[in-house]
Amino acid sequence: MRVTATFDKVADIIAETSEIDRETIKPESHTIDDLGIDSLDFLDIVFAIDKEFGIKIPLEQWTQEVNEGKVSTEEYFVLKNLCAKIDELRAAKAG
């Protein structure tokens, strides 16, 4: 399943970028609430994800949607949901 491969790569990136133990990173983990990733580390993680997958995560748009109450933080910041969004962006780019 592609989400698993995507999750494994994203979890590796998070572990490398934030020094969080790879074993503690789960698909259900919330990057902020559960893993304690701060905004600067998250920007580094997003940059690494963009580079790894050849996509551009619309972080400004996502943040705005969360701040305006259009979506919950879980929509974008729980890893299994983030990985699904990454796969959607990859599919859209592939056409």
Swiss-Prot record:
Which post-translational modifications are recorded for this protein?
Answer: 4'-phosphopantetheine is transferred from CoA to a specific serine of apo-ACP by AcpS. This modification is essential for activity because fatty acids are bound in thioester linkage to the sulfhydryl of the prosthetic group.
InterPro entries from the xrefs? ACP, ACP-like_sf, PP-bd_ACP, Ppantetheine_attach_site
User: Carrier domain location, by residue?
Assistant: 4-90
Per its UniProt record, what SUPFAM superfamilies does this chain match?
Answer: ACP-like
Q: Which domain of life is it from?
A: Bacteria
Query: One GO CC term of this entry?
Result: cytosol
What's an example Gene Ontology biological process for this entry?
Answer: Kdo2-lipid A biosynthetic process
Q: Which keywords does this Swiss-Prot/TrEMBL entry list?
A: Cytoplasm, Fatty acid biosynthesis, Fatty acid metabolism, Lipid A biosynthesis, Lipid biosynthesis, Lipid metabolism, Phosphopantetheine, Phosphoprotein
- Pathway, according to UniProt? Glycolipid biosynthesis; KDO(2)-lipid A biosynthesis
Show the GO MF annotations: acyl binding; acyl carrier activity
Which residues get modified to O-(pantetheine 4'-phosphoryl)serine? S39
Which Pfam families does the entry mention?
PP-binding (PF00550)
Compartments it resides in: Cytoplasm
Q: Which PANTHER family match?
A: ACYL CARRIER PROTEIN, CARRIER DOMAIN-CONTAINING PROTEIN
* Job of this protein: Carrier of the growing fatty acid chain in fatty acid biosynthesis. Is involved in the transfer of long hydroxylated fatty acids to lipid A.
Q: What name appears for this protein in its UniProt entry?
A: Acyl carrier protein AcpXL
Q: Which organism is it from?
A: Rhizobium meliloti (strain 1021) (Ensifer meliloti)
